[in-house]
Amino acid sequence: MNVVKIAAHWFAVLLFGLAGAAHAQGNLEINTPAIAALQQSMQQRHSQLGPLYASGAVGLAADGTVALRDASSVPLAQRGQANALIAAENADRAALYREIARANGHPEWESDVRKTFAQRWIDRAQAGWWVQAPGGWKKK
């Protein structure tokens, strides 16, 4: 299995493997056209982020975002593209958290949805990926 296929598999586990998770009486599995579009956008981008996760350049941050953890591991000519991917991913993640809270009828839950997803992303990260833990970054 190549890195892109492995990354796509893990993205599906991370994004869609949230079955049974709930926030209070909320539904993290709720589906709206906006949520579906965000998930599709994130899944398509993940094939490009996968090698960055695998190399350790990008890690899963404790706040539910992705972060450029080690810029020196990305060739200078590719850093702009890496930063653009990270920015797009983080914009979609923020929109996803907001939309899930809104779709549950509780926009005030956005920060709780973010915290729940942040922990799930980290818990389900592939071995070898970097995750932010209390005290700093660690390799899973």
Regions found by a protein language model. Give the residues of each.
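Bacterial N-terminal signal peptides that target proteins for export
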Residues: 2-11
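Terminal, compositionally biased segments
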Residues: 12-13, 140
